[in-house]
Curated annotation (Swiss-Prot):
GO annotations of cellular component type: plasma membrane
Organism expressing this protein natively: Rhodovulum sp. (strain MB263)
Region (TIR-like) location: 126-229
Keywords tagged on the record: Antiviral defense, Cell inner membrane, Cell membrane, Hydrolase, Membrane, Nucleotide-binding, Transmembrane, Transmembrane helix
Residues binding a nucleoside 3',5'-cyclic phosphate: 1-120
Protein name (record): Pycsar effector protein RsmPycTIR
UniProt KW Metal-binding keyword: no
Lineage top rank: taxon: Bacteria
UniProt keyword Lyase, yes or no: no
Lineage, top ranks: Bacteria, Pseudomonadati, Pseudomonadota, Alphaproteobacteria, Rhodobacterales
Subcellular compartments: Cell inner membrane
Gene3D superfamilies: Jelly Rolls
Amino acid sequence: MVGGDEVIANSFLEAGELVSFKRGEDIVSQGDVEDDSVYFLLSGAADVFVNGKRRDDIQRTAPITVGEMSALNPAQKRSATVRAASRQLVALKVEGETFRKVVGENREFLRRVHEDFSGRGRQAILATGISRRTSGWNWTVISLTAGVLSAAAIWYTLRVDGNPVFVRVLLPLVVGLTIFLLTLLADPVYRFFRLGTLCVGAILVDEALQWQVRGSFMGAEFQYQISSSGDPQQATALLAPIVLGALAAYLFWIDTTKR
């Protein structure tokens, strides 16, 4: 950030203080408004934590500055916690007032500060996109687990004698599927792709198989029969899954490139 400017470097060296941190010690703390100092990391690396969670995609490694945003806006709270990740981290601590004074006296330095802010903003946006891409299927597993547990709970409740077989079988399936879909739709990542895939899969199964259910409403057990579809006219119905598949692919492309 100093860009080899000896005048600026000497100003910071004269006013600054060498400080060291051991692994696990906080350099700056999220939400802090009292400390508006800037830390020029001279050696070592630090991890970034937001709301107590470590950002695996972001690490501050020397030479780099930490805390300049709060130095320029002293009333602003620290947006993240920066914690020493190296065995020992050495930094030059410059008070926020000194940093603001140097920035105000040197336009070129101010331009470099803004460029650094812009670069970190792009990095954060990129990291957010990557995080969203990798978390989509994790949410699918969560949704499936919620659906299975809900279905199991309903089945356990209705397992006692006296309930018709179709109630003990059908109701848990309906509840489980409903909970699965509701949980799935709660996650905005790839919802169109997964929902479209679910629709296509359901239609393909329906077209490929014949379903028969036999039995009386009261008392008698139901007989289920599933067989391959032998009707050649059903091949024309594959147009619907193809259209839905194309739509799902288009929405998936929007999710991955436009968001």
